[in-house]
Amino acid sequence: MEVILLERVAKLGQMGETVNVRPGYARNFLLARGKALRATENNKKHFEAQRAQLEARNLERRNEAQTVAEKLDGQSFVLIRQSGETGVLYGSVSTRDLAEVVTKEGFTVERGQFVLNQPIKTLGLHTVPVTLHPEVEVKVTVNIARSPEEAERQARGESVTEREQFNLDDLGLEVGQALADAGEGADDRG
């Protein structure tokens, strides 16, 4: 199915281009979201008549996205989640969670603007791309931790998933004596 793009669509084309796409993609995504028109003669004439307005609207949206991008680029956000000893989360962090935390900080970002190939399932610092406009993309850092103190440690670069190493001798026990005492107790029971 041939469609006329009303805005830039990633991996497809620029505004005003006539492209051939599968009918399902056209109906369910491009046409439904107002990103394209069917490429009929009437629509082509209508598009050419409205082209200046569409380009002005697109430029305005891009400028708005650019101002938000200047404030948002490089920002770091903290999410507190429960996890196991190894740092694997109980559950995961999705685009909905990211949109909530960024919105609480005063930015207007929708969940569809975050680019995640799969949900985040581990503690740590994660860099997430945010597409504010088809031509404007920024990266934010998400710090996922079990507590605010742990988030601060992660931000400094410390690993929070390593288990604390300790030495039995540091605990004030003599290992040889403790093992010998345990062995004598076993002989008494036998």
UniProtKB/Swiss-Prot annotation:
Presence of keyword Transcription regulation: no
Keyword terms of this UniProt record: Ribonucleoprotein, Ribosomal protein, RNA-binding, rRNA-binding
Matching Pfam families: Ribosomal_L9_C, Ribosomal_L9_N
Entry superkingdom: Bacteria
GO terms, molecular function: rRNA binding; structural constituent of ribosome
GO CC terms, sorted: ribonucleoprotein complex; ribosome
GO BP, sorted A to Z: translation
Protein role: Binds to the 23S rRNA.
NCBIfam families hit by this protein: L9
Family to which this protein belongs: Belongs to the bacterial ribosomal protein bL9 family.
Protein name, as recorded: Large ribosomal subunit protein bL9
